Structure formats: C-alpha cells, structure tokens
Amino acid sequence: DTTPCGESCVWIPCVSSIVGCSCQNKVCYQN
C-alpha cells in the first residue's frame, strides 16, 4: 500500500523522502 505524502515532485524532488516518501507519477508516496 502507498500513502500520499501530500507533496508533488513534478519540479523538485520529494522533501518528504527523509521520512520514507518517494516519487511516483509526479506525486510523493510513502511505501
């Protein structure tokens, strides 16, 4: 299951990657 992190990654990387979020389909998701 993937949970949206409420962040977009169209122009910049996911800042929320520090809490385990990654970019999928231009939106940051937590795996």
Curated annotation (Swiss-Prot):
Pfam families (alphabetical): Cyclotide (PF03784)
Keywords: Disulfide bond, Knottin, Plant defense
Cross-link (Cyclopeptide (Asp-Asn)): 1-31
Expression sites (tissue/organ): Expressed in seed but not in root nodules.
Disulfide bonds: 5-21, 9-23, 14-28
Alphabetical GO biological process terms: defense response
Keyword match Disulfide bond: yes
Spans traversing the lipid bilayer: none
Record PTM: Contains 3 disulfide bonds.
Top-rank lineage group of the source organism: Eukaryota
Signal peptide coordinates: none
Job description of the protein: Probably participates in a plant defense mechanism. Not active against Gram-negative bacterium E.coli ATCC 700926 or Gram-positive bacterium S.aureus ATCC 12600 up to a concentration of 100 uM under low-salt conditions.
Comment block on domains: The presence of a 'disulfide through disulfide knot' structurally defines this protein as a knottin.
Similarity comment text for this entry: Belongs to the cyclotide family. Bracelet subfamily.
Protein name per the record: Cliotide T13
